[in-house]
């Protein structure tokens, strides 16, 4: 939930200079007199401070006025709004700062003699956070730039390789198709005239030789008796 109430004021109160044996019940009894509470949180490491959150910012302001400098949990506490000063518009004059008290403790480290905005631990945390944020931002920018460059290089290197491989495949397939079609046409459909003539001659020659061998030999004239005719010799004249 928001730390600001419906009237726009601060609802969380800082309680400083608490003893090590401060209890949650004592704080609730002391601050609930001014209004209903939301949460009560007591620091343990380092100890010495607490935060009390009200439901209404006006109750928080009343608690600051009534309990600041009072003895709670066996020690004189310092009570103020968690921002250190009440919320104001930009046209209001900044209120006068509270005079420094050497007995006040810092709620960041628990030591006396300074406040949280002057704490060396708080300054270190702010520096480490700013450095980590700047480092992460620069790292993210470098990573995004290197990634975009690598993508551009990959796309450039991949496109000529793909185009070359595709052109080589197409040329090879076209040459194979041409060679196959040429061999089929030459073997089946397109024969040279010299081959056809030689085949026709080789086929016709044995037929002529067979016809000659089968043709009957010249017939000899025979007599009806079967013996060859002889010319009659002239009869002798006795």
UniProtKB/Swiss-Prot annotation:
Subcellular location: Nucleus; Cytoplasm
Covalent cross-link Glycyl lysine isopeptide (Lys-Gly) (interchain with G-Cter in SUMO2) as placed by the record, residue numbers: 24
Biased composition (Basic residues): 123-180, 196-222
Chain intervals for the UniProt region annotation (6 X 8 AA repeats of R-R-S-R-S-X-S-X): 153-226
Modified positions (Phosphoserine) in chain numbering: 32, 163, 165, 167, 181, 183, 192, 194, 196, 231, 233
InterPro entries in alphabetical order: Nucleotide-bd_a/b_plait_sf, RBD_domain_sf, RRM_dom, SRSF7_RRM, Znf_CCHC, Znf_CCHC_sf
Function: Required for pre-mRNA splicing. Can also modulate alternative splicing in vitro. Represses the splicing of MAPT/Tau exon 10. May function as export adapter involved in mRNA nuclear export such as of histone H2A. Binds mRNA which is thought to be transferred to the NXF1-NXT1 heterodimer for export (TAP/NXF1 pathway); enhances NXF1-NXT1 RNA-binding activity. RNA-binding is semi-sequence specific.
Homology family: Belongs to the splicing factor SR family.
Protein name per its UniProtKB record: Serine/arginine-rich splicing factor 7
Organism name: Homo sapiens
